[in-house]
Amino acid sequence: MNKIKHAIFDLDNTLWDFRKNAKLALAELYVKHDVASRYNFSFDEFHPHYHESNENLWALIRDKRITKEELRERRFREAFDNLGIFNHELADIFEHEYMETITNFNEVVDGAIELLDYLKPKYTLHIITNGFIEVSKRKLESSDLTPYFDTITYADELQILKPDPRIYEFAMEKSGAKKEESIYIGDDWIADAVGAKAFGMKAIFFDR
């Protein structure tokens, strides 16, 4: 049996708390643009619509049915449309400012730092993320996660997303790791757990 030498992580919602940080960023924009008083919908009414739209569109990206550019065009428009707010100019402003605002928040998943501190002396650590490259870099820097990792593989480098086996192959070549000596940890059943196992790696599904 091969000894595990490399631990490879997903980023969003595995280490960096996307759900919490996204909600904080959106709440800030909601107040900034006075949406509640202009349209008589509270943030708590808006947020589930955004979350559902974003999750559904990322699933379509994973299944190669839409592009990331289409996600950025659609997610806020759909969220506002579902509330009867047909203001696409406002939706587009939210999209632009959201991508800038979200990295002002740097909450990590509970226990993530303690886990990385424990693993770092024992294993070589890496990341593979499907997230937007420039935003992901800012997330890692603002949350002080970067120093833990020897390599970080961004899907945007290849224009290929997990669970496509080519992104795992690219990460192996980049890191010099062997899949038989690696384990992958992530919160997305299809992109992370199924994708890594199909490639031939051991995988841990982080079910939050």
Model regions and ranges:
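Glycine-rich phosphate-binding loop signature in dinucleotide/nucleotide-binding domains
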Residues: 1-2, 121-123, 174-181
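N-terminal helical cap/lid subdomain that shapes the substrate entry/recognition surface
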Residues: 2-109
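Substrate-recognition element of Asp-dependent hydrolases with the DxDx(T/V) motif
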Residues: 93-107, 112-143, 149-155, 161
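Acidic, Mg2+-coordinating phosphoryl-transfer loop and its flanking beta/alpha structural elements
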Residues: 179, 183-208
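Short loop-to-alpha-helix "cap/lid" segments that border enzyme active sites
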Residues: 163-174
